[in-house]
Curated annotation (Swiss-Prot):
Disulfide bonds: 31-50, 37-55, 41-57
One annotated Gene Ontology cellular component of this protein: extracellular region
Residues in the signal sequence: 1-19
Source organism of this protein record: Arabidopsis thaliana (Mouse-ear cress)
Protein name per the record: Putative defensin-like protein 309
Keyword GTP-binding annotated: no
Entry similarity comment: Belongs to the DEFL family.
Localization of this protein: Secreted
Keyword terms of this UniProt record: Antimicrobial, Disulfide bond, Fungicide, Plant defense, Secreted, Signal
Keyword Transcription in annotation: no
Amino acid sequence: MKILAFFIFVLLIFSCSSSMIMGVHYHEYRCHDWVDCAIWCKQWVPQPKCINRVCDCKPKSLPTNEEVPQSAYSSNSNY
């Protein structure tokens, strides 16, 4: 009985230390596609990317003036 309790204690210590080494949220970032990241990243981006099995929660950057097509400006020039 003491050996079983000791074995469980050692497993508990090992599991806690390995999660601390890898990081607290290690498993939350692992993914296969963007759907796996949706719950974790929903507060930052509506459809996150899964790059190399890791969730990318960075929001898309806003387009610069060079990236905006001219048709977007022509509709506002009538005012």
